[in-house]
Amino acid sequence: MIRNRGGAIIVQEGKIALIKRIREGETYYVFPGGGIEEGETAEEATKREIYEELGVHVKVEHLIAKVEYKGTEYYFNAHIIDGVFGSGKAEEFKLKDRGSYIPLWLPIHELEKVSIKPYEVVGSICNHYKK
């Protein structure tokens, strides 16, 4: 299914916020975010999805990467401004047939060592945070 998506790159104290997925015997990581609803901008979708998935409100800043992966995906630098990380109540977290969703902080230097989807974003993140 092709769907445009907004995602957040949240880095704090040398760690990046990710969601660990365990599904059908496969373990991989994704950047928090989700589908852009009709009438929403990519930035608005990113804020909404981050709250649903992580339980935090974010300030969305500049675009770090734009990737074609099952639709156009926009990844923004974002900072947590309120909330409790890991307290998200997204519907997909409750559906057993969707596998496990585990919000976590991964040391940014380990980003290139894990299975991450879409991997194309990793280079942009590494370049951005080496500045």
Over which residues does each language-model region extend?
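A conserved beta-turn-beta hairpin within the catalytic core of GNAT-like acetyltransferases
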Residues: 24-27
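Conserved hydrophobic "DFG−1" position in protein kinase catalytic cores
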Residues: 10-11, 18, 78, 105
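The catalytic Nudix box helix
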Residues: 31-63
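Active-site-adjacent beta-strand/loop module that shapes the phosphate/pyrophosphate-binding cleft
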Residues: 67-92, 104-110, 121-129
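Structural detector for helix-capping/boundary residues
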Residues: 14, 34, 48, 106-109
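An amphipathic, aromatic/His-enriched active-site/gating alpha helix that lines ligand/cofactor pockets
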Residues: 92-100
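Conserved N-terminal beta-strand and adjoining loop/helix that marks the start
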Residues: 1-16, 38
